[in-house]
């Protein structure tokens, strides 16, 4: 699972989810990609579940790129704890995904295999997304 090795600050403010993605909006490495249409926090478990769904479907063929990284900690206070006494401890890590961001890329497989693998991965993610193809000459 994707977790930062070390961070400057253990606890952070929640990132803003509004606005469109500034970079990473085109397919760069592979031939096919998943592009987010709505904003969301994608956890490290969801990224791993989508990756496993894709790689199991394409079996040994093709290559997968993960273009997002969960670098923001989300904290949580224990159950039945009174309010106050500081912020809770970090529980999981999220990637702040904005609309237009390409999350995963895939190449080295046929079109129907790529579309089905990416469709399976989209179902594991907490956002609306679409499958896009690389533009320009291959």
Swiss-Prot record:
This is Large ribosomal subunit protein uL16. Belongs to the universal ribosomal protein uL16 family. Keywords: Ribonucleoprotein, Ribosomal protein, RNA-binding, rRNA-binding, tRNA-binding. Gene3D superfamilies: Ribosomal protein L10e/L16. Residues 1-19 have a biased composition (Basic residues). GO terms for biological process: translation. PANTHER family: 50S/60S RIBOSOMAL PROTEIN L16, LARGE RIBOSOMAL SUBUNIT PROTEIN UL16M. GO terms for cellular component: cytosolic large ribosomal subunit.
């Amino acid at each position: 699972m994707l977790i930062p090795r070390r961070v400057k600050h253990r606890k952070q403010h929640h990132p803003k989810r509004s606005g469109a993605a500034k970079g990473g909006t085109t397919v760069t490495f592979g031939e096919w990609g998943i592009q987010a249409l709505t904003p969301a926090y994608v956890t490290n478990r969801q990224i791993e579940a989508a990756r496993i769904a894709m790689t199991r479907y394409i079996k040994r063929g093709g290559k997968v790129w993960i273009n997002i990284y969960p670098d923001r900690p989300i904290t949580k206070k224990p159950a039945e704890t009174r309010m106050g006494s500081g912020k809770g401890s970090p529980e999981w890590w999220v990637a702040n995904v904005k609309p237009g961001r390409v999350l995963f890329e895939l190449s080295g497989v046929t079109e129907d295999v790529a579309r089905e693998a990416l469709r399976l991965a989209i179902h594991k993610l907490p956002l609306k997304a679409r499958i896009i193809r690389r533009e320009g000459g291959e």
